[in-house]
């Protein structure tokens, strides 16, 4: 049984479906909408997307489990994904993971006691030329050191910016394209 999402989420998915000749093409953005509203994708969210798109839930689940940008369990308000593949590993990704573990007192896949942070190690995020890097919610932070990551996290804790894709995409469209995303928050 699918969970009930807001009327706004329903309308957004209906609008998305109109943008594609085949509604199945809207699976990924529909998953984002469900995740933005619920915080993660549980089985009810998968069912909700499947019902809206008109396909079997297993096909939606295949997409949701393939990509690391979809959270299959609850995460912190700010979810850090540390790239661990070759370029990032050679440039210091392990140190970033260790630093997060020590700073937050959690292991990958856990949520901090205050609910503010979680982190995980993921496969390539596609920013090999600026390794090591992390993605916090939907924003890339590149050429990181543990000290630079601390600066970013401290600023996030102070300013509590909205780092969801829908809001950062809108802001990037307002003349900010080309600036480092870490300067935008």
Predicted regions and their residues:
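Signature of N-terminal electron-transfer/Fe-S-associated modules in redox systems
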Residues: 1-185
């Amino acid at each position: 049984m699918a969970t009930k999402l807001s009327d706004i989420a329903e309308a957004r998915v209906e609008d998305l479906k109109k943008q594609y000749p085949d509604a199945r093409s809207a699976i990924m953005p529909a998953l984002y909408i469900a995740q933005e509203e619920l915080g993660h994708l549980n089985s009810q969210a998968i069912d909700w997307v499947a019902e809206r798109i008109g396909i079997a839930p297993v096909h939606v689940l295949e997409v949701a489990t393939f990509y690391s940008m979809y959270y299959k369990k609850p995460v912190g308000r700010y979810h850090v994904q540390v790239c661990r593949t070759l370029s990032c590993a050679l440039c210091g990704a392990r140190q970033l993971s260790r630093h997060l573990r020590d700073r937050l007192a959690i292991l990958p896949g856990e949520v901090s006691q205050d609910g503010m942070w979680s982190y995980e190690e993921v496969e390539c995020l596609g920013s090999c030329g600026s390794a090591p890097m992390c993605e916090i919610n939907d924003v890339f932070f590149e050429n990181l050191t543990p000290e630079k990551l601390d600066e970013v996290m401290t600023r996030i804790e102070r300013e509590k910016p909205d780092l969801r894709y829908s809001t950062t995409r809108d802001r990037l469209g307002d003349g900010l394209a080309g600036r480092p995303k870490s300067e935008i928050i």
